[in-house]
């Protein structure tokens, strides 16, 4: 949520800031602005709406000159999306200019204190409180002021500040919100995420909580809140700039759907050797795995759907009790965690605020934490006992596709590792299953050929007001994901239900022509789900059945049939999700929606 960029160097700051903000659009935003310093004065241009609106406004005012600046895309939390509430904000008499991601929890009491001191507020934001507070503490020493601000506020933040009497300098800090420093030659950069600086440098500092960075064009110095200099290793980005570009595709989501075979292959292949699973990142011994009392899985959004699938898979293959929680619920219900329990946290960004808080809750109760993360060196990755990276590469579209599939791949690997440790996976069976796993990329390549068929299906149902998804077991977990994909990018109301729950109220919503996706790929549950298909069909539903090649009998009761290859039942989620992603994509395209940046959503939810 929100995005920060900064630049200090010898080149014009404005185009660099704008380019950086465009690379952060995936994070979600409703307004944007930049501030550029020149000749002891910092000028601000900001507006509600998209970055193109900001560019138009910059053109109207003749642009901003200067070689030092900061920029921001805002996702509204305190105050409506307006020009006034957009960042950057001024502090004091205008000598301080500040941008901020996060939430300041004690902003009301600080605002009252500052108002009593004569500070005048023009916006509804908590960020303006930070700007005035920085001015309040600023006596000519940027580091002193930042430390005092950090000791005064409560909440989460990444912040960047310009002071008019310190030309050529940016000071920044973070707590529970990501921030990186890009290292150049005669120039340095600041950003919420790597794509914003990748055009200019591959070398970065990844700031940790309670760290401060002071940037000039020739130097970057890091400090802690005791003002000690912090020495940090340089992180070198290995993936290509093209990985964060569309490369001829109409949308990032379309490109990332097509990249799923590679994401799964790259996640699996280093961890399968000669038909055996090897996860060197996982330090749990066989004895520790045998003594696991319960696996607690915590995640948000689509990652939670991966966790739902993981529960079924772990319990089936390893017979270890498993509980899957929404991270936002887990942390507040005082979960019961006993000795020997482990917690698996799943997050694409590694910065999801609720998931990070849940991780800390689990660790405080003595659980060993294993994370499944896509972004290297992210906060969740750093704070976990073990981290297993998905090799999906940068995922730009807000709606996850390839990261979701790579997360499932890690779940399969963990299930095999756990099953082997507890003595439930003979060597020959392990070889059979790993062979099936390594077939997934090619099977998905074949499913991508269903594009025309699914586009035709989208044309048929694009006018629908409601779409329902049903399934049992693992098919229910993927029904949840299919429903979420559809509603988050096409804005069509959609719900997923466990098929066995239809008679407990949901079936009353089925009317003549209501589209119902029935995911029915699990052999042992097929007949039961077929019964549910008959129930909704009898009430006028248009049934789209998603089945394997083995389930020919469904054709008699379904209006449309989508077939996926047969594989081990526990691996079917990776195949089932592909047609649902493609269908959702074309529904959104046909409805004229912003596929990559759905309204009100953010890629990385870094506030609670």
What does each model-identified segment do?
Residues 1-251, 262-294, 305, 332, ...:
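Conserved short alpha-helical segments that host acidic/polar catalytic motifs at enzyme active sites
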Residues 67, 71-84, 273-286, 310-346, ...:
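Glycine-rich oxoanion-binding loops at beta->alpha junctions
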Residues 260-264, 268-296, 386-515, 588-608:
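Active-site phosphate/pyrophosphate-binding segments
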Residues 156-187, 457, 462-488, 530:
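Acidic/histidine-rich
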Residues 290-439, 519-563, 583, 591:
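Glycine-rich phosphate-binding loops that contact phosphosugars or nucleotide phosphates
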Residues 227, 542, 555-557, 567-608:
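Generic C-terminus detector
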Residues 68, 96, 294-296, 342, ...:
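Structural motif
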